[in-house]
């Protein structure tokens, strides 16, 4: 695919016309040596929908370890042999500290993440009660508590949590290679229930877990069909003791191609680069915005250290971009 065709696709995307599947498949199969040719077009689409504003989010690991699911990549799975921390649901004071950290560091959105297939209803109520006392003041609230039902979502929404995070993780055709203790359809149902409850949905996946380039596209199209609002893109950090500890499917250029492909497939949806940004993209990680990303996760990840928010703010300023604030 030549640069002119990419730019023509970008102009069509800006007008709300998503590319033909055959064109997206051609992008998915593009050799790595041509990936940088995608960036001007992908960046044009990002800039059309988001201007120079960048979405920043951060998370706190609200409950860690002893998860009964067997996700091949996860350090918190009971099936893994790792040194990941194990602790119960944190108290409300620690939840408040996470929100304060976001506010003090100019972060647009704060999310509480809990391990496990689903958080017990009593603990969902505890989380909702804590969020109800946080107040807004420039930060939007998100939760990632597993496979919940309509009653849970109504409780969270009433407490001021306006977005729910629940990844599909990978393409449906690859899902059973990654997880066998629950079904892909369970994740889809959760996303639909959250949307039905009137919540914004953040749903994406993890890359570098054995998926093909066409399966990257398959996931992107599934997310498009579900009409999710924000798509977190994670790149595998192989963790010793997990089934994917020796996985090495990623290069900096492949990461950029994945971002660009998703931008073309998803049009004006948020694309937020999360786990594995620095370790996989290395010196190229500031290029995520030019590849089509509209945001990044800053601060620490669930079980791995991340990047200082002030470093990310400095990078954003050097790129001529600005950090988004809640309400803008």
UniProtKB/Swiss-Prot annotation:
InterPro entries recorded: Aldolase_TIM (IPR013785), BATS_dom (IPR010722), Biotin_synth/BioAB (IPR002684), Biotin_synthase (IPR024177), Elp3/MiaA/NifB-like_rSAM (IPR006638), rSAM (IPR007197)
Reactions it catalyzes: (4R,5S)-dethiobiotin + (sulfur carrier)-SH + 2 reduced [2Fe-2S]-[ferredoxin] + 2 S-adenosyl-L-methionine = (sulfur carrier)-H + biotin + 2 5'-deoxyadenosine + 2 L-methionine + 2 oxidized [2Fe-2S]-[ferredoxin]
EC number, as in UniProt: 2.8.1.6
Designated name of the protein: Biotin synthase
Protein source organism: Desulfatibacillum aliphaticivorans
PANTHER family: BIOTIN SYNTHASE, BIOTIN SYNTHASE, MITOCHONDRIAL
NCBIfam families, A to Z: bioB
One Gene Ontology term of the molecular function aspect: iron ion binding
Stated role: Catalyzes the conversion of dethiobiotin (DTB) to biotin by the insertion of a sulfur atom into dethiobiotin via a radical-based mechanism.
Residue positions binding [2Fe-2S] cluster: 111, 142, 202
Co-factor binding comment: Binds 1 [4Fe-4S] cluster. The cluster is coordinated with 3 cysteines and an exchangeable S-adenosyl-L-methionine.
Family annotation (Gene3D superfamilies): Aldolase class I
Name of the top EC class for this enzyme: transferase
Family that this chain belongs to: Belongs to the radical SAM superfamily. Biotin synthase family.
GO aspect biological process, one term: biotin biosynthetic process
SUPFAM superfamilies named among the record's database cross-references: Radical SAM enzymes (SSF102114)
Subunit structure: Homodimer.
Required cofactor(s): [4Fe-4S] cluster; [2Fe-2S] cluster
Binding site for [4Fe-4S] cluster: 67, 71, 74
Pathway stated in the Swiss-Prot or TrEMBL entry: Cofactor biosynthesis; biotin biosynthesis; biotin from 7,8-diaminononanoate: step 2/2
Domain of life: Bacteria
Keyword line: 2Fe-2S, 4Fe-4S, Biotin biosynthesis, Iron, Iron-sulfur, Metal-binding, S-adenosyl-L-methionine, Transferase
Radical SAM core domain ranges (all copies): 50-277
